[in-house]
């Protein structure tokens, strides 16, 4: 049966003469229709190598759908990896709530899935987009593949709403792509149905692809050779308000204590994060506040930095592959492998705690090297191919 839909297919699958006058075709009996749904920059980074791997296979027809949750930042990532979206739901509105995002995503995806009839929907992580896409697929009895499955803090409200999102996705997914053995254990203990595959984390695939080119990161006024640069990223909802004030104060103390350091802080676009950090740090001569870096710039910054202070999950996974210690600006983490493996330390948002641990690494070369040389527990850059193999196995192709 030949169906005319907007899935992307490798041209060698069908006789080109049969495609004349038609937009895009796939042969349903030969190709598995896979829909990747994403909305945020972390999803784009972690799904990009997976999408590229599926698009290079003759067995799959792919569709890339954006919800529009982080349009500009997603577009940057897509360009870096040479990808284009097939659909954009454009759901974002000013001052919308989590309910608004979920409602509009569900409505848009319900209509879209009925139109394109994917045989499997692949989502990543724990965003509202991922949850809504999984739920929309479940409502139409479409199998769901969950990339980065099995992360847990065991506190339903921390992080919020991510912990609930990923638990709920796990209850309805048929394919669980777990990055580590601990994630596999979490899924097994929770009694999920479906197949669990330990694949490693796809962010390592993305990181190694970009890092090979040694991407530049030119920051006006920042001399990378003059300072030990501390790279920081802060965005999590749990750190809004007083915790942000404490984080900013700790950064000032570190800069005061170590005159050979500088702070590079790409600011999140959310004013709730952006404004207090600008007020606290904006006047310091060794603080460099920038707009969000695109992914290649971020990788270049990690490569050149000495130490990372971040509440980002991706940073906890990426930095160890580049030999950079991470201080996690949270009280809990769903990536405890980084802590037990010695590549990261939980420092929370207490001023004294952040300052003390950072000072130890900046003053003690042995302590620094112990973290910098620890083995990354999140994989070796082959996760995307392992995911493709698992989907092939699921469909027995």
Task: Identify the meaning behind each predicted range.
Residues 123-124, 146, 176, 300-339:
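A donor-sugar binding/catalytic signature common to diverse glycosyltransferases
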Residues 146-160, 174:
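A short, histidine- and acid-enriched strand-loop-helix "catalytic/donor-clamping" loop
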Residues 122-140:
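An aromatic- and histidine-rich active-site surface loop
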Residues 26-68:
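N-terminal subdomain of nucleotide-sugar transferases
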Residues 65-67, 71-72, 169-242, 347, ...:
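A nucleotide-sugar donor-handling region in carbohydrate enzymes
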Residues 58-104, 108:
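Conserved nucleotide-sugar phosphate-binding/catalytic loop shared by glycosyltransferases and other
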Residues 182, 345-397:
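Leloir-type glycosyltransferase catalytic cores
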Residues 72-77, 96, 214-304:
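Donor-nucleotide binding loops and adjacent catalytic segments primarily
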């Amino acid at each position: 049966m030949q169906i005319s839909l907007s899935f992307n297919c490798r041209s060698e699958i069908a006789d080109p003469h049969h495609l004349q006058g038609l937009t895009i075709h796939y042969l349903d009996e030969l190709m598995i229709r896979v829909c990747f749904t994403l909305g945020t920059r972390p999803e784009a980074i972690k799904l990009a190598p997976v999408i590229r791997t599926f698009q290079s296979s003759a067995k799959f027809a792919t569709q890339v759908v954006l919800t529009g949750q982080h349009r500009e930042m997603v577009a940057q990532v897509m360009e870096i990896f040479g990808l284009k979206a097939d659909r954009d739901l454009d759901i974002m509105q000013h001052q919308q709530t989590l309910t608004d995002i979920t409602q509009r995503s569900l409505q848009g995806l319900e209509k879209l899935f009925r139109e394109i009839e994917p045989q499997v929907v692949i989502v990543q992580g724990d965003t509202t987009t991922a949850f809504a896409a999984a739920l929309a697929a479940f409502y139409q009895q479409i199998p769901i593949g969950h990339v980065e499955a099995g992360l847990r803090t065991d506190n339903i409200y921390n992080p919020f709403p991510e912990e609930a999102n990923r638990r709920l996705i796990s209850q309805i997914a048929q394919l669980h792509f777990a990055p580590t053995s601990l994630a596999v254990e979490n899924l097994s203990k929770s009694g999920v149905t479906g197949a669990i595959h330990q694949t490693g984390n796809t962010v390592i695939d993305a990181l190694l692809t970009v890092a090979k080119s040694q991407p530049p990161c030119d920051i006006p006024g920042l001399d990378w050779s003059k300072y030990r640069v501390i790279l920081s990223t802060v965005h999590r909802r749990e750190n809004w308000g007083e915790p942000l004030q404490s984080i900013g104060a700790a950064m000032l103390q570190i800069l005061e204590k170590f005159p050979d350091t500088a702070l590079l802080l790409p600011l999140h676009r959310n004013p709730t994060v952006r404004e207090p950090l600008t007020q606290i740090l904006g006047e310091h001569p060794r603080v460099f506040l920038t707009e969000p870096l695109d992914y290649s710039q971020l990788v270049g910054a990690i490569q050149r930095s000495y130490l990372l202070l971040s509440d980002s999950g991706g940073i906890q996974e990426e930095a160890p592959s580049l030999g950079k210690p991470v201080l996690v600006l949270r009280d809990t983490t769903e990536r405890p492998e980084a802590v037990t493996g010695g590549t990261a330390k939980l420092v929370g948002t207490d001023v004294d705690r952040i300052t003390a641990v950072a000072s130890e690494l900046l003053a003690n070369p042995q302590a620094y090297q112990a973290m910098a040389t620890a083995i990354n527990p999140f994989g070796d850059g082959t996760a995307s191919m392992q995911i493709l193999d698992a989907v092939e196995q699921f469909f027995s192709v």
